[in-house]
Amino acid sequence: MQTRPSSEPHRSRDQVTDGDRNRDQPQKCASATLAKKPVTPPAAPPPTPSNRVVAPLTVPVIQLTPAQSDSPVKLARPATPKETAISVPDHSNKENQPARTPPPSKSCPLGAPTNYVARRTWITTERMNELRRKAQEAAKQNKIFTIRGCFNSVRNALLMRGWVEKLDVHRKVMPAGQMTYEDLTQRLPKRKAGETRRQYVQKCERNIMSRFLEHMPVDFLWTNRKEKCDYIDQAKNPGMTINKFHRAPFTSKEGLCSQLRDFHWFFEEGTAEMYFPRCYNVWSPEELGEFIENFKLTACVAFLRAMLCKYHKQGSDAVFSCSGKIPYSAIDFAYKRLVEYIDSCQHNDIDFEDPPKIWEHDWDAFLFQHQQLVNEDGRIQHDGGQRLEPMVKSCLSLVDKMKVHWPQYSLDGYQNMWIVKPANKCRGRGIILMDNLKKILGVVNLSIASKSRYVVQKYIERPLILFQTKFDIRQWFLITNTQPLVVWFYRESYLRFSSQEYSLSNHHESVHLTNYAIQKKYTNGKRDKRLPSENMWDCYSFQAYLRQIGKYNMWLERIFPGMRKAIVGCMLASQENMDRRPNTFELFGADFMICENFYPWLIEINSSPDLGATTSVTARMCPQCLEDVVKVVIDRRTDPKAELGNFELAYRQVVPPTPAYMGLNLFVKGKQVLQKANHGGGHGHYYYQQQRKERSLATSSVYRQRSAIIHPATSISRIHRAMPTFNATEYMEKYMVEPLSSSRSSLCSQLPQKSPSAAPALTATPSGATSSYILKQAGRSITQLLSATHKRNTGGSLSGEQVQSTALPPKRQRSCGPRLSSTNPVESTEKKFKILIKNYSSNGNENMQDARPEVANSATATAISERKWRSLRNIAATAGGSSNLAARSKGPPLIAPPSLPTRRLTRTKSEIDSTGMHAIGRTFGRKSNGPRLPISISVQALHRGEPIVAALKQATSELQLSQAQMMSPRTALANKLNGSTLMVPASALPVG
């Protein structure tokens, strides 16, 4: 006998015989084929029952096709008890000796049948095909769900609605894409003790249908915890519904504290209101400082309240004594601190000086005195010399004023007790009650060192207690959408009691923490017999108690509406930080405490509330709540009028509809006030972009000035753009001096040097002729331009002379910027820009006879030092070149004649103010061709595109230079030294 794989037990001899006997009977194999492409297997001997093939569910439509004939399947005979019993093989001789079949045992529960024939008795081929058709229908209707955990209420509710469960198990995927009958029926779950046969068969059938759906996506996922693989499934299948939000910041103590700090922006009377004890994330230094300040002020309030309470209830002897350990100054200390706080709330401290400095040792002493008064029954020292009634009245009046400025006055008591909680833990783990500031800071500082976070929350010292026992309320609510926000509120809730009587002197967790995970560890103490032994009440029992004490209206007017408004307010404050993915919902559990005035105070919100049947109360309410969740999430999707169970709509956010687009063309209608910049023919933008690429912005002082100071006439839209660098000399060289197709190199070295004798006689011409002539010479250099102008003024005639532009070498200086390759004509804009030459006469006599003036003037020397010109020797050395350097150095120093007028260029359209920016441009020419002569040009004028040609036209028409002044290079240098800003190299002028 051949052995089976290790995953399946061996078959007995009887089973093998039954299998061989069934081979002679006609069989039919149910195989799955596509409806569009039916497949019929070829004629072959009928297969054995052990290798029947059942195709998986891979397409929406599946068709059943008989394997051999249309005859019905002939089922095997019913199995005997020996066949259904678990067989134990004999390993002594596996081939010759058959295995012995032990008798059935009553103590061992029956598991899944181990052979094909036995399995056919409870899952036949027809039943297998029926399960496959059911899975097929669920796949068509998108009714495939997966549940992680024991949520049988959700599972049963979905199964009743025709859903099919896909088990979340890790099985080996069949590579062939087809599964045999053995693959579907092997490794089925075992039968549990006490489980009926019907229940076990249903469980096995669900397992088989899940194997049909192995390759299908899930449409509904219920899980306790969202895992990483779920994000991948959501991205692949956006239509999948899941019961967990990716981000719900209010579910942690740290996140709830942070979110509710902005609640005042979402407050809406009657809809979003909340009572939340003040809480601080003490891992933050800012909030830690706020907590320390609030702790001290709370101690001051508690000190005065405790003193007044004892004084009115027990008399003055219970508070004051001659032998008291608490000094009388403690009352004055607390009184002054509260007065300062009220003044700050009323903004009365603005007009006063800073409050006196309170040292830390003063606070430490007062906090110790507060502990003596409250916990140790200490008395205040008083000798009886002062009357107590005025002091008591003033303290009572001050405490009444504090009720207005202390919103949580009803929450506080006399102990100044705070509760320290881990920021991201649940089930009451790590929670400590403390009333000592130093101990709290010790825990907090230790947590900072260990990278753990804590929150410190004010403990409710005056809660509503039932039969001297503390309790809280667990309230469920459901979020089905975040944008817009939809909140469902559950009508029923339950109360959780502590196992010990309430006492502020006992800080044990069994007294103050009502979590079931905490209270189940302790037995109930000596309490009132009317309290439940399971420490739980439903809301109906609590309402009956309120009816007995005459406060039933408080449930309908304060408690139930207050919890609903608090949840809505918390969700509105956290809406912006929640996950906005559609098809997502989650059930939350909120914990509330009730104060003595019957107002609910929100404590925390849990993302995975305990829904187990721990007590008789939760055994009834939790399954009902889960079924109602399915009604809201599943039924209401297809039927808006479906039953919702105990859920009611608490809040639905109304989002105003987006206005329809009507095809309107919106534009700004108006008139342009400022003119666009036009740099000499509309080529400035390209020029500036090229210049910006090759020159760094940080190295240009002009750019830094333009970035810091914007001219008033500059367009507003240009302020936000990076302004390009600008150089006045390069601009003049491009549009005035050099042909635009030539390179930027030295000009003076290429100019022809003509002697005065060779120059033709020039005749005086009117200014109009001079202007027209200058416009024709726009492409020439400024040296040639001024030389020709001088000749025309001296009587020469150039009417028959054809002036040609001098060809410039391709060489250029490294610092001269980009090579200019475009040629554009110079546009005459005479009306836009004018240059006046203002004469500033200098003291002294004119001496024009000598070509080398020898008159010295201190004022001229002062002007030279103020303008920071170069030394006279350097100017003389660079002016004449190497040929005539010795001849020029022999004469007296070059000093301007005292009577020689000084000329300066300025604008006439708008006078240049003191804030106008001027750029001293770099001179053109090499060092050997003469001195570097600066040119002062308004940057704003050049940036607006006002060319210099028109300026020179007006300048040359008004400039009256004598022949001796223009023919002498020393005279030109003297003009430079006297402050003239429009100069030419001396070597470029004709030698007289």
From Swiss-Prot:
Enzyme class, first EC level, given as a word: ligase
Q: Does the keyword Nucleotide-binding apply?
A: yes
Q: Where along this sequence does the record place binding of ATP? A: 457-460, 470, 472
Q: Per the record, a Pfam family?
A: TTL
The record, for SUPFAM superfamilies, names: Glutathione synthetase ATP-binding domain-like
- Tell me a GO biological process for this protein: axoneme assembly
User: What are the Basic and acidic residues biased-composition ranges?
Assistant: 7-26
Q: Which segments carry the region annotation Disordered?
A: 1-54, 68-113, 746-766, 791-828
**Which keywords are on file for this protein?**
ATP-binding, Cytoplasm, Cytoskeleton, Ligase, Microtubule, Nucleotide-binding
**Which superkingdom, per the lineage?**
Eukaryota
Which GO terms fall under molecular function for this chain's record?
ATP binding; protein-glycine ligase activity; protein-glycine ligase activity, elongating; protein-glycine ligase activity, initiating
The terms describing its cellular component in GO are: axoneme; microtubule; microtubule cytoskeleton; sperm flagellum
Where in the cell does this protein reside?
A: Cytoplasm, Cytoskeleton
User: Function, please?
Assistant: Polylycylase which modifies alpha- and beta-tubulin, generating side chains of glycine on the gamma-carboxyl groups of specific glutamate residues within the C-terminal tail of alpha- and beta-tubulin. Involved both in the side-chain initiation and elongation steps of the polyglycylation reaction by adding a single glycine chain to generate monoglycine side chains and by elongating monoglycine side chains to polyglycine side chains.
Kindly provide the name given to this protein in its UniProt entry.
Tubulin glycylase 3A
Per the UniProt record, the lineage of the source organism begins with: Eukaryota, Metazoa, Ecdysozoa, Arthropoda, Hexapoda
